[in-house]
From Swiss-Prot:
EC top class, as a word: lyase
Protein name listed in UniProt: Argininosuccinate lyase
Cellular component GO terms, alphabetical: cytosol
UniProt-recorded Gene Ontology molecular function terms: argininosuccinate lyase activity
Length: 469
């Protein structure tokens, strides 16, 4: 009977009086997307088999046969020779059926003391743990590229913006290091998420545990888990670890999207702060002159894709009673695509950032517009005893006058400045123009976290040192 069931692929079919329809088979099968879990499924099965043998639940001969068969199956999968079958429903039954075909009854004993419920939960955690580590490395690569570019531009002055209006001068290096901070927090979130992913569900079986004398801690140790899931119902039924990862991934993409928006803006001919290497751009099928920043534009769009996956997983879980439900089969495609999208995006962005051409003259010209040193003039007056609100009002008046005349504050002569600001004329000296230069403005922000070039260089060094931790 069992052999026939394995041949048919329906490990549960003895309970039913008619076979599943072909349409339902296609509808319920997951093998053509969950087969990417195959290698971690094999790793989990080998750890389980070793534990079963150590606990005298299966024989040493069975274990040797299982290890031999799994080695062959792993090779077939890696060479692309493994034949995946829709009738076998999922990655687990495909591998088990092939194992049984290779080694006979020993293959049928592998599933002793476990269910596909705890098996798949283990597979996902094993796989996701590896992907979190990979994404952490890719975040480091992007941070490193940003730090390199920031160090090269510690003295490059550009306008800082609020409300997309010129606000105060900053250095381009300081601006880039803001994204280093964001991606550093993303890396921290990934590491923190990993601690909750790295718990072993195996041993929970279907939902209640198993009557066999298993050793869950031994399996956890052999697979590199930090410990076991403490409750069997929770172990098989919840996917909060996948949701948490996807939320962290959505934040990664949100930061990428913000950076992308600025890259698109900076590359626009009307701004012209940077150029992106040709290999990251496309042209137009009708307009010969076009060079379009497709990579950052697509990254903005793909952020919505990852956000959608987060909502899909949250919605998937919100109405499920304990314990396992078939709904959970729908966790894999959003999770897989999130990993692929984030990993591809980070890898491309690290390469793209390294190839950015900076245009300092355009940045400086933009910083000279929009009265970006107005706050410096107000600070100058405050340091001479004027209350800040009064200084703010006086400088706002001066800005209005200059705006009407189409000139900058620095274009006023000392006499003109005193004449236009009679209430504070006695506070204004020849040194006022030192405060109205772009270099003087950024140099004055010489404190940790400030935009002064020396602080930017120090922050870049600290950020680089943090990459090694």
């Amino acid at each position: 009977m069992t052999s026939q069931l394995h041949k048919k692929g329906e490990a549960w079919s003895a309970r039913f009086s008619e076979p599943m329809s072909e349409l339902v088979k296609r509808y319920t099968s997951s093998v053509f997307f969950d087969k990417r879990l195959a290698l971690v499924d094999i790793a989990g099965s080998l750890a389980h088999a070793n534990m079963l043998a150590a606990q005298k639940i299966i024989s040493a001969d069975d274990l040797a046969a299982i290890e031999r068969g799994m080695a062959q199956i792993k090779g077939e999968i890696e060479r692309g020779e493994f034949e995946w079958q829709l009738d076998l429903e999922d990655v687990h039954l495909n591998i088990e059926a092939r194992l049984t075909a290779l080694i006979g009854d020993a293959g049928k004993r592998l599933h002793t003391g476990r269910s596909r419920n705890d098996q798949v939960a283990t597979d996902i955690r094993l796989w996701l743990r590896g992907e979190i580590d990979r994404i952490g490395g890719l975040l480091n690569d992007l941070r490193g590229a940003l730090i390199d570019l920031a160090e090269q531009n510690a003295d490059t002055i550009m306008p800082g913006f609020t409300h997309l209006q010129v606000a105060q001068p900053v250095t381009f290096g300081h601006h880039l290091l803001a994204y280093v901070e964001m991606f550093s927090r993303d890396a921290e979130r990934m590491r923190d998420c990993r601690t909750r992913v790295n718990r072993l569900p195996l041993g929970a079986a279907a939902l209640a545990g198993t009557s066999y004398p298993i050793d869950r801690h031994a399996v956890a140790k052999s697979l590199g888990f930090d410990g076991i899931c403490a409750n069997s119902l929770d172990a098989v039924s919840d996917r909060d670890f996948a949701i948490e990862f996807t939320a962290a991934a959505a934040l990664v993409m949100t930061h990428v999207s913000r950076f992308s928006e600025e890259l698109v803006l900076w590359m626009s001919p009307r701004v012209g702060f940077i150029d992106i290497a040709d290999r990251f751009c496309t042209g137009s099928s009708i307009m010969p002159q076009k060079k379009n920043p497709d990579v950052p534009e697509l990254a903005r769009g793909k952020t919505g894709r990852v956000n959608g996956h987060l909502m899909a997983l949250l919605t998937l879980m919100k109405g499920q009673p304990l314990a396992y439900n078939k709904d959970n089969q729908e966790d894999k495609e959003p999770l897989f695509d999130t990993v692929d999208t984030v990993a591809d995006t980070l890898r491309i962005f690290a390469e793209m950032v390294a190839g950015i051409t900076v245009k300092p003259d355009a940045m400086r010209a933009a910083a000279l517009q929009g009265f970006s040193t107005a706050t410096d003039l107000a600070d100058y007056l405050v340091k001479r005893g004027l209350p800040f609100r009064d200084a703010h009002e006086a400088v706002a008046h001066a800005v209005k006058i200059c705006d009407d005349r189409g000139i900058d504050l620095a274009d006023l002569t000392l006499d003109e400045m005193k004449r236009e600001l009679p209430n504070v004329a006695q506070l204004i000296g020849d040194d006022v123009f030192d405060y109205l230069t772009l270099e003087g403005s950024v140099a004055s922000r010489n404190h940790p976290g400030g935009t002064a070039p020396d602080q930017v260089r120090a922050a870049a060094q600290a950020a680089r040192a943090a990459l090694g931790k």
